[in-house]
Amino acid sequence: TLFVVMDYIEGESLEKIVQLYGPQPEEVVIDWAKQLCMVLGYLHNQNPPIIYRDMKPANVMLKPEGTLKVIDFGIAREYKIDSLKDTTNLGTRGYAAPEQYEGKGQTDQRTDIYCLGVTVHHLLTGKYPEEYPYELIPITEFNPMLSGGLERIIMNCTQRNPENRYQNCDELLYDL
């Protein structure tokens, strides 16, 4: 008999928070993005680096004291220096970076940065990225009070070509 034991995490997923309360305030989302950047940076700095590949509000728990916990490492993988591409294409539609489903190359830390950018967009707008029109509309079109700087950060995270994104979480954290 096989038993799987998992930690109980008190709190709610960020997806549930957005469902219940709608788009979240910019200052709160920036704090959450910084926390998630530090988590991803930690994973990417392991030897070998760990690529999470499934960042989305449903996989982030908000604990009562305001800290976040990333859950569901089911499709995380080690980055393989000698590999030209991933063996399987996995990810959540709308949140997954293009390289996750096009089979063009190996996912790396820039893949997680893309997913984080989409997650931040969702938290600020309340719009699921897998809904029509299947593209990220600038956040200021949803709420003109949101900052243009944060809009540029999201756009930099979610560039189609990984070479045009932030190259690591330190760069993103600095801009946040």
Task: Spell out what each predicted region is.
Residues W32-A33:
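Activation segment signature within eukaryotic-like protein kinase domains
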Residues M38-I50:
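Protein kinase catalytic-loop region centered on the HRD/HxD motif
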Residues L62-G66:
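Activation-loop N-terminal segment of eukaryotic-like protein kinases
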Residues G94-L176:
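C-terminal lobe helix-coil module of Hanks-type protein kinase domains
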Residues L14-Q24:
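AlphaC helix of the protein kinase catalytic domain
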Residues L68, K80-L90:
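Regulatory activation segment
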Residues T1-S13:
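Conserved short submotifs of the Hanks-type protein kinase catalytic core
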